[in-house]
Design a protein with these regions (language model features):
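Conserved acidic carboxylate
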Residues: 13
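C-terminal output helix
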Residues: 90, 107-117, 124, 128
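The feature encodes the CheY-like receiver
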Residues: 60
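Acidic catalytic/metal-coordinating carboxylates
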Residues: 38, 63-66
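Acidic, metal-coordinating helix/loop segments flanking the phosphotransfer/catalytic sites
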Residues: 34-52
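Two-component/phosphorelay signaling modules centered on CheY-like receiver
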Residues: 16-34
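Alpha4 helix (beta4-alpha4-beta5 surface) of REC/receiver domains from two-component response regulators
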Residues: 66, 86-104, 114
């Protein structure tokens, strides 16, 4: 499979088995993927200007929504997928406000691939490629 141009993904997930599974899945689909397990590591990796951030909501003291907002300060076209292990309407509303997709764990592999593809085909993501 040919590598999608300009499709760099940063995954921030504190559960190591989930993180490694998502990294492997997305790499096998042809994406360039960096996976880290903490907010601090994610914040540092935002300097690499990923096209998409997939982040767990709960990341210790901070949360994935804060990380997405921080990333957009550097890269306004950064696409976001926020993942949580619990149903929370407040998190869902905040994700909608940030124009990010919201997924609940466990995330089906086909669903993750579909949501990632949609996020990277969005108009804001297209601005990064052109």
């Amino acid at each position: 499979m040919q590598m999608p141009a300009g499709r760099n993904i940063l995954i921030v997930e504190d559960d190591e088995s989930t993180l490694s599974g998502w990294v492997e899945l997305l790499r096998s689909a042809g994406y360039l993927v960096t996976g880290v397990s903490s907010y601090e590591e994610g914040r540092q990796e935002l300097a690499t200007m990923p096209d998409l951030l997939i982040t767990d909501v709960r990341l210790g003291v901070y949360n994935g929504l804060q990380l997405l907002m921080r990333g957009r300060m550097v890269n306004p076209q950064l696409q976001g997928i926020v993942v949580t292990g619990y149903a929370d309407q407040i998190v869902r509303r905040e994700a909608v406000y940030l124009q990010a997709e919201h997924l609940e764990k466990p995330v089906d592999a086909d669903r993750l691939l579909q949501v990632v593809g949609n996020a990277l085909r969005s108009p804001a993501a297209a601005l990064r490629v052109n």
